[in-house]
């Protein structure tokens, strides 16, 4: 079952503007949004995911893979691999690398648990995320978020992975 809040502090969020196969203005507040994050390899950085508690329309899952982010350090002009999944369908869009999207700025603030940070970032994409199946594409022209990244590998997030729902 998805948790009801992104950050315990109440200040998590996701905002994004989407065009193309999905036309949407996303404005997800902390309440009702689930977020999780962890370090990633190849290339090294962090991966953050955002999803609304079921019931939203469209039911989307966003994954941001940000290159070159290190524990506790700010980042600028970092490449981002963006994936958008429409839950309950076979629609999956990805930039297939970090050259189409950029994080302008990223800041980290330590939270109570060791190795866990509030990560706030804003950025944009200059090219669309293409459908894995089909010819559609989605342009995430702007995005900004505040979520949680656990660098320690022992977070609650690892115990409760996102459910990808497919029909």
Model-derived features with residue positions:
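C-terminal or internal capping secondary-structure element at the end of a domain, subdomain, or sheet
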Residues: 112-167
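N-terminal low-complexity, Pro/Thr/Ser-rich intrinsically disordered segments
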Residues: 1-22, 158-167
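Cysteine-centric signal of extracytoplasmic or virion-exposed proteins
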Residues: 3-6, 35, 101, 125
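Surface-exposed helix/loop patches within compact recognition domains
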Residues: 10-116
């Amino acid at each position: 079952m998805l948790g009801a809040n992104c950050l315990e502090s109440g200040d998590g969020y996701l905002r994004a503007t989407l065009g193309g196969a999905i036309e949407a203005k996303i404005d997800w507040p902390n309440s009702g949004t689930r977020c999780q994050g962890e370090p990633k390899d190849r290339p090294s950085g962090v991966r953050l995911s955002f999803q609304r508690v079921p019931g939203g329309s469209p039911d989307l899952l966003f994954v941001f893979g940000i290159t070159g982010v290190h524990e506790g350090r700010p980042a600028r002009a970092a490449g981002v691999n963006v994936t958008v999944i429409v839950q309950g369908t076979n629609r999956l869009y990805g930039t297939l690398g970090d050259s189409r999207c950029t994080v302008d700025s990223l800041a980290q603030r330590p939270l109570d648990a060791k190795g866990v940070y509030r990560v706030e970032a804003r950025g944009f994409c200059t090219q669309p995320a293409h459908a894995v199946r089909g010819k559609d594409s989605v342009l995430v022209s702007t995005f900004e978020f505040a979520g949680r990244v656990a660098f320690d590998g022992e977070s609650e997030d690892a115990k409760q992975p996102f459910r990808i729902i497919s029909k």
